[in-house]
């Protein structure tokens, strides 16, 4: 039995469910109504666009076009990470982009080439979905980690300088802040891994089962998706912090102004 298609009429009926959260958002005057409507509209337009684009990506199955698509995803993810953490693009755009690129390529290629043993590692059927899953799942944890790391450094500069003044290397002085970033960013992911299959069925597994794969195949893919996501997220963070530290600190170890200061409007 193949996957049951959702007609456009059925899709419209399904979208009516949004009226429930929209009602409560409006009723309690949260101020989120406009943002929710815009976000939903963007999601619909973007997904339809991606659906059309992916159709031709799979049809052409060209390695160069596939890799170009991954580069576009990395640039968008880097810009999103910078925007969500309020970090300066001039200083951190390259470290963040390189962190995404290196981790996604290394871990993604390891999975496709060594674990799946595909002859054509750039096959659109596997290359695009795997890299897309990695990018999507890495983004939130990396945003939390970057925000925690730089906010901690900015808030606890005296501790950082104290450690440097007492003979610690720059790497040793940064260790407490990296530790906090890892704890805050990866604790939810670890908790999610520990209850996988008991409390929640992940989207990848459900998608494969709906697509006709056996539960055993879907389970093994889901295991690997969690492993490669966890690994790529950690590798990306370490690469990013290592590269960013060269621009984030001056010759004396002082943190440069890497975060965009929010302007406070003065009252008339």
Describe the residue ranges of each PLM region:
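Structural signature of hydrophobic alpha-helical transmembrane segments
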Residues: 4-16, 60-75
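Loop-to-helix entry region at the N-terminal start of transmembrane alpha-helices
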Residues: 6, 10-13, 65, 91-145
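C-terminal ends of transmembrane helices
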Residues: 21-31, 77-88
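Loop-to-helix transition at the N-terminal end of transmembrane alpha-helices
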Residues: 31-53, 58-70
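Short cytoplasmic-facing helical segments at TM-TM junctions of multi-pass membrane proteins
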Residues: 148-181
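Transmembrane alpha-helices
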Residues: 173-199
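Non-cytoplasmic
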Residues: 191-216, 220, 236
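Hydrophobic alpha-helical transmembrane segments of polytopic membrane proteins
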Residues: 216-245
């Amino acid at each position: 039995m193949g996957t049951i298609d959702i007609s456009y009429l059925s899709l419209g009926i399904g979208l009516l469910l949004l009226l429930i959260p929209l009602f409560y958002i409006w009723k309690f005057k949260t101020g989120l109504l406009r943002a929710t409507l815009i976000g939903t509209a963007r999601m619909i337009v973007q997904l339809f666009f991606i659906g059309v684009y992916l159709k031709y990506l799979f049809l052409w199955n060209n390695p160069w076009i596939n890799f170009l698509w991954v580069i576009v995803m990395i640039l968008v993810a880097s810009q999103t990470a910078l925007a969500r953490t309020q970090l300066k693009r001039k200083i951190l755009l390259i470290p963040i982009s390189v962190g995404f690129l290196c981790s996604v390529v290394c871990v993604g290629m390891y999975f496709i080439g060594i674990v799946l043993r595909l002859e054509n590692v750039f096959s659109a059927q596997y290359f695009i979905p795997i890299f897309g899953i990695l990018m999507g799942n890495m983004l939130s944890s990396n945003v939390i980690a970057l925000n925690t790391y730089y906010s901690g450094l900015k808030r606890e500069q005296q501790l950082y300088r104290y450690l440097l003044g007492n003979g610690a290397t720059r790497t040793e002085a940064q260790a407490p802040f990296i530790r906090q970033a890892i704890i805050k960013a990866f604790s939810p992911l670890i908790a999610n891994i520990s209850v996988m299959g008991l409390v929640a069925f992940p989207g990848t597994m459900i998608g494969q089962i709906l697509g006709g794969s056996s539960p055993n195949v879907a389970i093994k893919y889901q295991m690997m998706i969690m492993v490669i996501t966890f690994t790529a997220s950690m590798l990306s963070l370490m690469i990013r912090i290592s590269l960013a530290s060269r621009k984030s600190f001056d010759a004396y170890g002082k943190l440069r102004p890497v975060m965009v200061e929010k302007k406070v409007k003065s009252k008339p």
